C-alpha cells in the first residue's frame, strides 16, 4: 500500500487523475488527511464511494501512533515512534502558559557527532520521510493545542533537507495543516551548501547552533566546523537576512569552564555584529558517560551579563523533560548504547 500522508497536493492530484478521478478530489483528500484526523480513506465522504473504494485498493492514509509515551514531572510528554523501516525517533510536547511547543525529529540518530549531544553518540540510523516528520504533529492528542513547532529533535534537518522542506510545506500550506511558517523554527549546525539553498528560499524561522565562536574550540566539540566554519555561516546570513515575519536566532549550549567566560562573550558579539538576532543559552543537560558539566547559576548569570554588556540580546532557555530524557541533547529514540 502507498501512503498518502507525506504527499503534497500536487502529488495527490497526480494520483487522483491517474485513477481517472476529478481534480477537486485531491483537495478533499488532503484536507481530510492534514486537517481532520482522518485515519481511513473511507472517512472522506465528500468524494464518491466508488472512487474511495478504488483508492483503497492501492493507497492508505499512512498515519501511525507512537509506541510509547513518557510524562515528566513538569508535564512535558515524550513520544517514541517507530516507522515502517524500524527507525526509532522521538518528539516532545511542552505545554506552557503562552505557548504549547512540539519538538520534532528529522532523523533517527545523527551523523554530526557533536560531543555534548547524546543523540550523536548513538550514531546515524536513517533519514525520516516527510510522512514520518508530519505524522509526529498529526498523531499526538495535543495536536490542536500546539501553536509552535521546533525542528530541534533527533537529527540534523539540513542533512535531510528535501524531506524536511517537503514536510514544512505540508505543515504550512492551506491545503495542508495550515500551520503558520512564522511559528516553526528549524535548528541547524550550519551546513553551508544547504544553508545557501535555505536562504534562497526560506520557509520557516532559522536557529543556528553556535556553541563556540572560536574555530578550533568549536571544532573540538562540533566536528562539522572543519568543513562548515561558523564564520562563513554567519556571513551567509548577513548577506541574505531573513525577511519578516521570519527571523534568525542562534543557540549556545553552555558548558562549564569551556565556553562561558568573557573571552567567549566578546567574540560572540564580534561574530554576530550586524545581525538582528537573539542568542538562546541552553544549559548543558547531563547524560551518563560525559565529562562536560552544566554551569553553576552564578557562572551562567555572569556570562549573560557579559553578553548583554557587549550588546548581545541573550537569555536562558529553560530545559524541559530532563527526568525522562526529553531535554535538548538527551533524545535517543530508544537506541541507547
Language model features with spans:
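Auxiliary Fe-S-binding modules of radical SAM enzymes
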Residues: 1-89, 238-247, 252-337
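Short linear Ser/Thr-Pro motifs
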Residues: 70-72, 105-106, 187, 209
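Generic beta-strand structural signal
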Residues: 77, 89, 100-104, 112, ...
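P-loop NTP-binding catalytic core
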Residues: 86-94, 98
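Canonical Radical SAM [4Fe-4S] cluster-binding loop centered on the CxxxCxxC motif
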Residues: 95-132
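Ferredoxin-type iron-sulfur electron-transfer modules in oxidoreductases and energy-metabolism complexes
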Residues: 131, 135-143
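Conserved AdoMet/S-adenosylmethionine-binding subsite of the radical SAM
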Residues: 142-148, 153-317
Amino acid at each position: 500500500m502507498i501512503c498518502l500522508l507525506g504527499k503534497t497536493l500536487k502529488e495527490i492530484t497526480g494520483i487522483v487523475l491517474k485513477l481517472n478521478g476529478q481534480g477537486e478530489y485531491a483537495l478533499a483528500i488532503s484536507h481530510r488527511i492534514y486537517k481532520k484526523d482522518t485515519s481511513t480513506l473511507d472517512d472522506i465522504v465528500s468524494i464518491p464511494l466508488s472512487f474511495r473504494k478504488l483508492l483503497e485498493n492501492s493507497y492508505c492514509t499512512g498515519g501511525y501512533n507512537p509506541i510509547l509515551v513518557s510524562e515528566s514531572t513538569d508535564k512535558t510528554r515524550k513520544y517514541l515512534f517507530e516507522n515502517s523501516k524500524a527507525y526509532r525517533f522521538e518528539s516532545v510536547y511542552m505545554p506552557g502558559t503562552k505557548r504549547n511547543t512540539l519538538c520534532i525529529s528529522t532523523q533517527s540518530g545523527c551523523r554530526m557527532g557533536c560531543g555534548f549531544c547524546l543523540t550523536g553518540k548513538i550514531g546515524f540510523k536513517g533519514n525520516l520521510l516527510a510522512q514520518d516528520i508530519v505524522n509526529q504533529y498529526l498523531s499526538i492528542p495535543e495536536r490542536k493545542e500546539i501553536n509552535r513547532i521546533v525542528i530541534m529533535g533527533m537529527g540534523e534537518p539540513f542533512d535531510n533537507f528535501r524531506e524536511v522542506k517537503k514536510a514544512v510545506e505540508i505543515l504550512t500550506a492551506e491545503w495542508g495543516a495550515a500551520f503558520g511558517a512564522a511559528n516553526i523554527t528549524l535548528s541547524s549546525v550550519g551546513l553551508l551548501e544547504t544553508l545557501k539553498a535555505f536562504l534562497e528560499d526560506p520557509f520557516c524561522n532559522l536557529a543556528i547552533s553556535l556553541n563556540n565562536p572560536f574555530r578550533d574550540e568549536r571544532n573540538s566539540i562540533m566536528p562539522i566546523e572543519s568543513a562548515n566554519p561558523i564564520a562563513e555561516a554567519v556571513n551567509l546570513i548577513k548577506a541574505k537576512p531573513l525577511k519578516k515575519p521570519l527571523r534568525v536566532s542562534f543557540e549556545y549550549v553552555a558548558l562549564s569552564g569551556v565556553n562561558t567566560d568573557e573571552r567567549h562573550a566578546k567574540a560572540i558579539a564580534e561574530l554576530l555584529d550586524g545581525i538582528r538576532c537573539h542568542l538562546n543559552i541552553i544549559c548543558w543537560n547531563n547524560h551518563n558517560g560525559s565529562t562536560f558539566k552544566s554551569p553553576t547559576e552564578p557562572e551562567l548569570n555572569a556570562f549573560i551579563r557579559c553578553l548583554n554588556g557587549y550588546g548581545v540580546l541573550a537569555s536562558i532557555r529553560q530545559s524541559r523533560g530532563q527526568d525522562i530524557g526529553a531535554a535538548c541533547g538527551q533524545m535517543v529514540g530508544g537506541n541507547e548504547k
